[in-house]
C-alpha cells in the first residue's frame, strides 16, 4: 500500500512540474486564447541563467544571441569565459617572396648600405674640415718674404693662400721694355706703373687667367711667362700678349716692410 501511494505522489509531482513549464511557455493575448511564445530560445536561456548550480556557468552574450550595449572590454569583464579567441588579423603570415626577385632585393639593400656609408663618410669629413681654419682666417693670412737672396733677372715662387706667387727682380732693360709697350695693342690695357710699387720688383699671382694653369717663368714670345696648357703668353709685366687668356696676371695686395722685406697679404 505504501509503495503504491509513493508512486502516485511522484507521478503527480512530475505532472504538476510539467504543467507549470508548459503554461509558462504560453502567453495570454487580448482574446484570452493561448499563444505560443515567439522566442523559445530566450526562455530557455533565461531558465539556464536562474539555475543555482555552481557547475553551470553563464554563457557569454554573443553565444546567447543577445546584443550588449556595453563596450567589449566591460562585457568581457562582466561575462568572463575560458574560451580563447585568437585575433587572426594580428597573426597573419605573409606569403614567401618570389625567389626570382631576390637579386633585386639584394641590390636594393646593398645600394642602401652604400648610400648610408657615404653619408657617414661625408659627415665625418665635414666635421674634420670644420676643425681647420676658416676662409676668413685664411683671407687674413699674410706672408713675409726675404728679397735679399733674389738675383736680378731671376724669378722665385712662393705659396700664399694656397696659390703660387711669382716675385721677379727686374733689370733696367726689363723695366724699359715694359714701359715701351703700346697700350693699344694690349687685350687688357694697363700701364706697367699701375702694376708695380717698385719698378725693380714685380709681384703677380702665378695662375693663368684662362683656365687656372700655372705659367712657366722666363718663357714665351715676350720674355715673361708662358702657359703650357693652352699657349697664353705674358710679357715682363705680367700682361697678356698672346693666346686665349682674357686678362693680365693678378697683382696681389703687398707692401714693403724694409728695403729687402716684402709682406704679401
Swiss-Prot record:
Rieske domain location, by residue? 175-263
From which residue to which does the transit peptide run?
1-53
Note the NCBIfam families from the entry.
Answer: Rieske_proteo
Q: Mark the transmembrane ranges.
A: 103-125
Protein's name in the database: Cytochrome b-c1 complex subunit Rieske, mitochondrial
The record describes its membrane topology as: Single-pass membrane protein
GO terms under biological process: mitochondrial electron transport, ubiquinol to cytochrome c
Q: Which gene encodes it?
A: FES1
Species for this entry: Solanum tuberosum (Potato)
